[in-house]
């Protein structure tokens, strides 16, 4: 029924005549979920600690899980269960009568969380510009003890906090067990971890794999706590890591088809798709950087699978994304970011004034090369003959207008802003190569005034640019410091936002709503597998 609703949606609004068929293809590639039953490994107690990440840590409690699960419940008690790993799925609470019989409902507040501070920071007054509804706390009224209660809401996290809000004194009952049905479509890892990794890199590798595994559901989600949806930019990075881990290419195919089928009225990809109750796009979310990364995902999918039928089927979508991007390019071969109202996302540092014009110029050049490569593999270069010439002219225009030969860096926008992202994308696009690339990256990274990356997403591209520029020792050090910093601060899965110098950084103005298991942060596996000689 839901799939039908979705098909109806595309039939009535589709830009591409094959959209309804594409949606069926997406359904046909939907993976099954694997289930793992998890139980808590220990009880923990929170401690405010300004040396801990975001000011809170958990210590082992002297009470065992079985002692906690036989304690008569009384209002005011708080139990915190530690499951020892990050999980995505469904929580079941079991209660058991210990003495006499139930004479009043039991009232509990349960909360799942990924990080200690998320469970211990007061949430009111709510400070984020995202909904309070993302927090995973629920009030339960249990009318019948001795019956399992399974929460219908899917949750994500490692810790479960149960507060007793109301319990009768005239009978005793205990929270006899808590279990968690953890789900993921990832399955077994198909690729072995390289043998020669240092202990620190091994730890980073493990956390990366866990991050991707948790985000692999019936789509690649960005974060299983939040936003629980499919974003094109996250998909690109996830698909790269999937190659070197679970190799579930059907999931990538499903996601490519969903974006194509649910494109906007003008054929551009909508940046993100919400899967439930039926797949639908977040109407109006037009983000050109992610439109173009969809092309790269299709190219990488083709390289991984050799599935030319799918790539041929979807080629027109890739071409449409490219045409749309080229419509912003003026006679001077500069991408005009003000031409239309569009979201150009490279990093959440956009809230701190990151200027994206130079990075967008470069991202367009990179996309032209990638789309041309796709056309070449599909025998369709005759349709895009002009691409290499445009890319060459855009490269020259970037050097002419944005490159400061004296300082050896790319400046962005009218204020001539210096940022690491501008250099990164210029290197990725081949606008800066060799010694010039090294100089630009080194200068921006060392300059305190330059805008540094604020997310693992942006950092991924920095590490990639370093490798491309031949700064291999620096790339290894940067990756180890950045992702290793999260591991040292207790990450079981990698976080959405991370600044080594600011544990409270939040793109949403309130850190508890940040996602601590975030797709775009899982890429160390990609680097360690793709460049074994660099990361060992
Ligand atoms: C965030 C999402 C996602 C990202 C977009 C731009 O809210 O979590 O990961 O791709 O924004």
Spans of features found by a protein language model:
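Short linear Ser/Thr-Pro motifs
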Residues: 6, 113-115, 419
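Extracellular/oxidizing-compartment recognition motifs
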Residues: 11-222, 250, 270-275
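Active-site lumenal/periplasmic loops and adjacent helix-entry segments of GT-C-fold
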Residues: 228
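Active-site core of glycosidic bond-cleaving carbohydrate-active enzymes
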Residues: 231-536
């Amino acid at each position: 029924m839901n799939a039908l609703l979705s098909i109806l949606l595309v039939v009535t609004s589709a830009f591409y005549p094959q959209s309804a068929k594409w949606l069926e293809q997406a359904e046909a590639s939907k993976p099954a979920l694997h289930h793992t039953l998890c139980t808590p490994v220990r009880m923990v107690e929170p401690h405010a600690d300004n040396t801990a990440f975001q000011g809170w840590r958990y210590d082992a409690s002297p009470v065992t899980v079985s002692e906690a699960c036989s304690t008569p419940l009384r209002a005011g008690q708080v139990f915190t269960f530690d499951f020892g790993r990050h999980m995505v799925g469904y929580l079941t609470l079991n209660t058991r009568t210990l003495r006499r019989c139930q004479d009043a409902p039991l009232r509990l507040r349960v909360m799942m969380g990924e990080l200690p501070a998320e469970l211990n920071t007061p949430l009111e007054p709510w400070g984020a510009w995202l909904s309070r509804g993302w927090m995973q706390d629920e009030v339960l009224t249990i009318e019948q003890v001795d019956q399992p209660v399974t929460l219908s809401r899917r949750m994500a996290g490692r810790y479960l906090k149960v507060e007793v809000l109301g319990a009768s004194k005239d009978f005793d009952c205990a929270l006899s067990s808590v279990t968690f049905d953890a789900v993921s479509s990832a399955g077994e890892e198909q690729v072995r971890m390289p043998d020669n990794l240092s202990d620190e890199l091994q730890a980073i590798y493990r956390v990366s794999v866990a991050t991707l595994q948790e985000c692999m559901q019936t789509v690649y989600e960005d974060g299983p706590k939040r936003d629980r949806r499919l974003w094109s930019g996250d998909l690109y990075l996830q698909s790269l890591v999937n190659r070197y881990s679970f190799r579930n290419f059907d999931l990538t195919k499903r996601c490519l088809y969903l974006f194509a089928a649910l494109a906007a009225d003008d054929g551009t990809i909508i940046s993100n798709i919400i899967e439930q109750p039926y797949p639908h796009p977040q109407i109006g979310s037009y983000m050109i950087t992610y439109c173009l990364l969809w092309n790269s995902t299709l190219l990488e999918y083709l390289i991984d699978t050799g599935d030319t039928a799918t790539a041929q089927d979807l080629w027109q979508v890739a071409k449409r994304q490219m045409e749309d991007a080229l419509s912003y390019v003026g006679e001077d071969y500069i991408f005009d970011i003000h031409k239309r109202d569009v979201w150009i996302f490279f990093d959440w540092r956009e809230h701190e004034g990151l200027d994206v014009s130079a990075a967008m110029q470069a991202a367009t050049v990179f996309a032209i090369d990638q789309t041309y490569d796709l056309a070449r593999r599909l025998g369709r270069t005759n349709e895009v003959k002009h691409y290499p010439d445009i890319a060459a002219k855009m490269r020259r225009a970037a050097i002419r207008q944005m490159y400061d030969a004296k300082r050896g860096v790319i400046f962005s926008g009218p204020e001539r802003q210096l940022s690491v992202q501008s250099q990164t994308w210029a290197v990725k696009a081949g606008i800066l190569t060799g010694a010039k690339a090294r100089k630009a990256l080194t200068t921006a990274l060392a300059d305190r005034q330059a805008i540094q990356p604020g997310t693992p997403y942006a950092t991924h591209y920095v590490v990639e640019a370093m490798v491309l520029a031949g700064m291999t020792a620096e790339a290894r050090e940067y990756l180890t410091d950045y992702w290793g910093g999260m591991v040292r601060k207790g990450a079981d899965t990698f976080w959405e936002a991370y600044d080594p110098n600011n544990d409270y950084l939040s793109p949403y103005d309130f850190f508890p709503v940040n996602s601590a298991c975030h797709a775009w942060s899982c890429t160390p596996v990609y680097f360690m597998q793709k460049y074994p000689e660099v990361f060992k």
